[in-house]
Curated annotation (Swiss-Prot):
<keyword id="KW-0479">Metal-binding</keyword>
<protein>
    <recommendedName>
        <fullName>Lysine--tRNA ligase</fullName>
        <ecNumber>6.1.1.6</ecNumber>
    </recommendedName>
</protein>
<dbReference type="GO" id="GO:0004824">
    <property type="term" value="F:lysine-tRNA ligase activity"/>
</dbReference>
<comment type="similarity">
    <text>Belongs to the class-II aminoacyl-tRNA synthetase family.</text>
</comment>
<dbReference type="InterPro" id="IPR045864">
    <property type="entry name" value="aa-tRNA-synth_II/BPL/LPL"/>
</dbReference>
<dbReference type="GO" id="GO:0006430">
    <property type="term" value="P:lysyl-tRNA aminoacylation"/>
</dbReference>
<dbReference type="Pfam" id="PF01336">
    <property type="entry name" value="tRNA_anti-codon"/>
</dbReference>
<keyword id="KW-0648">Protein biosynthesis</keyword>
<dbReference type="GO" id="GO:0005524">
    <property type="term" value="F:ATP binding"/>
</dbReference>
<dbReference type="InterPro" id="IPR002313">
    <property type="entry name" value="Lys-tRNA-ligase_II"/>
</dbReference>
<keyword id="KW-0460">Magnesium</keyword>
<dbReference type="InterPro" id="IPR006195">
    <property type="entry name" value="aa-tRNA-synth_II"/>
</dbReference>
<dbReference type="InterPro" id="IPR004365">
    <property type="entry name" value="NA-bd_OB_tRNA"/>
</dbReference>
<dbReference type="Pfam" id="PF00152">
    <property type="entry name" value="tRNA-synt_2"/>
</dbReference>
<keyword id="KW-0030">Aminoacyl-tRNA synthetase</keyword>
<keyword id="KW-0547">Nucleotide-binding</keyword>
<feature type="binding site">
    <location>
        <position position="411"/>
    </location>
    <ligand>
        <name>Mg(2+) 1</name>
    </ligand>
</feature>
Length: 504
């Protein structure tokens, strides 16, 4: 594994440190200041006449990102999570022979070191640290990529995220924002009186959304289990039990394709609110975005690729209406199954003739409308046939009290007034079974226990899911879901395939 000549040279240096009585993997650090704090508390040095203060002493630590070795003195740049700092190392300020025998011969870019010293400003006007002592904390035996400003190979970045994080500070910034989004999301719902809960990750029935599940086996019980597609049915059981506002932030798993907006495991928040409707959730969603933007200090008009997304403008339009007003689909065909099939065929699009009208309307939306929804848009009134868990509209029984929120052509949220009629729910599940038999692999399974829960009475409730990954993509101007996941799913490399074959 470590046959590379450059790695071998670094291993030799680590061994030389050991021979000199220096542990190249020390477990003790005396750091008392992060780099950002050092730069902040010493900003007044620029105002001092001598541009230095030898009475101050700080100990910082970080990875060497740049090394300019000179005769009796050297300049380094080290980086910790908070920032980068220039270090001045002079031979005569270190213990005898340390500079020539240890520092110059065995320390290099990539190593993690600890330095103590005082602040000063260089002749070029850069606040730096004048080293009085230096200690190696971790010897890196693999050299960093040559490019100081990072690695450009995306495949390598995703497979070796640790290396990507070392080399690209902007990547670290993205994941700081992601973490803050999750933290703010939790705080927003807690402030609204919601209770955070945890529900099972392994389900006896693949349910909660229309998707293909991952299957595993529970050895102790001798039964198969499904990694959860969505937590919806368990959260609604809690509403039946008497909790009136619950949320869960966690992973979901869908055994489907990967692309710029889909990863087999992803993070979402789902929340359910008793005595509310989907219209209340539209208001809540707007408040949520306002809260995020305020606390992230983001402008309300954000660039996203070629677009500028205006988060001051949330529009709302029924799905059927969007087909002809936004998608350009002829208005006279949108309620006729045969005409839709002919229209799809005329546009060189495949359509299963076994699909019902609502499913075909969904196909039209996916093909002709979704990508055009740039500014935040609530698409409402989805057909019953593609909304097996949503409540029927009282005014239009063939439609549901549902919305999906789209931004930059991507679905960000899905919400509806919940179906709480157990008989209607049973019939919907039976319809989904028929759809599965007709070839719909993603149709919902029958869940008799959930129907039984509804039979005890569930208060009028509205529920919603928001995809955290896609939301972070919008907020950070990233165009692949892999760029907002620390460790995205990747195709196995040849060694992994060979190892798996041997184990089998």
């Amino acid at each position: 594994m470590f046959e590379n000549i450059y790695i071998q040279q670094r291993i030799e240096k680590a061994n030389k440190l050991r021979e000199d009585g220096i542990n190249p993997y020390s477990n003790e650090s005396s750091r008392n200041c992060t780099i950002s704090k050092y730069l902040n508390v010493n900003s007044d040095i620029f105002q001092l006449e001598e541009k230095r203060d030898e009475n101050r002493n700080y100990t910082v630590a970080g990875r060497i990102k740049f090394f300019r070795l000179m005769g009796k003195a050297s300049f380094l740049k080290i980086e910790d999570e908070s920032g980068m700092l220039q270090i001045y190392v002079a031979r005569d300020n270190l213990p005898e022979n340390f500079y020539n025998e240890v520092f110059k011969k065995n320390i290099e870019v990539g190593d993690i070191i600890e330095i103590s010293g005082y602040p000063f400003v260089t002749g070029h006007g850069e606040l730096s640290l004048h080293a009085d002592s230096l200690k190696i904390l971790t010897k890196a035996i693999s050299p960093l990529p040559e490019k100081f400003h990072g690695i450009q190979d995306k495949e390598l970045r995703y497979r070796q995220r640790y290396l990507d994080l070392i080399m690209n500070s902007e990547v670290r910034k993205t994941f700081h924002i992601r973490s803050k989004v999750i933290s703010l999301t939790r705080r927003f719902f807690e402030n609204k009186g919601f209770l955070e809960v945890e529900t099972p990750m392994m389900h006896p029935i693949a349910g909660g959304a229309n998707a293909k599940p991952f299957v595993t086996h529970f050895n102790a019980l001798g039964v198969d289990r499904f990694l959860r597609i969505a937590p919806e049915l368990y959260l609604k059981r809690l509403i039946v039990g008497g909790f009136e506002a619950v949320f869960e932030i966690n992973r979901n798993f869908r055994n489907e394709g990967m692309d710029a907006t889909h990863n087999p495991e992803f993070t979402s928040i789902e929340f359910y609110w008793a005595y509310k409707t989907y219209k209340d959730l539209i208001v809540l969603t707007k408040e949520y975005f306002e809260y995020l933007f305020e606390n992230l200090n983001l402008p309300t008009i954000l660039p996203y690729g070629e677009f500028k997304i205006d988060f001051n403008k949330f529009s709302e339009i029924p799905l059927i209406q969007s087909l002809y007003e936004i998608g350009g689909v002829p208005q006279d065909i949108v309620e006729d199954k045969d005409k839709i099939l002919a229209f799809l065929k005329a546009n060189n699009l495949e359509a299963n003739a076994n699909l019902n009208l609502g499913q075909l309307q969904g196909e039209l939306f996916d093909e002709f409308v979704e990508a055009k929804l740039i500014n935040p848009t609530f698409i409402t009134e989805y057909p019953v046939e593609i909304s097996p868990l949503a409540r029927r509209s009282d005014e239009k029984p063939h439609l549901t009290d549902r919305f999906e929120l789209f931004i930059a052509g991507k679905e960000i949220a899905n919400a509806f007034s919940e179906l709480n009629d157990p008989i209607d729910q049973l019939q919907r599940f039976e319809g989904q079974i028929a759809a599965k038999e007709a070839g719909d692999d993603e149709a919902h399974e029958m869940d008799e226990d959930f129907v039984n829960a509804l039979s005890y009475g569930m208060a009028p409730t509205a529920g919603q899911g928001i995809g955290i990954d896609r939301l972070v993509m919008m907020l950070t101007n990233e165009h692949s879901i892999r760029d907002v996941l620390l460790f995205p799913a990747m195709k196995p490399i040849k060694q992994e395939i060979d190892l798996y074959s041997e184990e089998k």
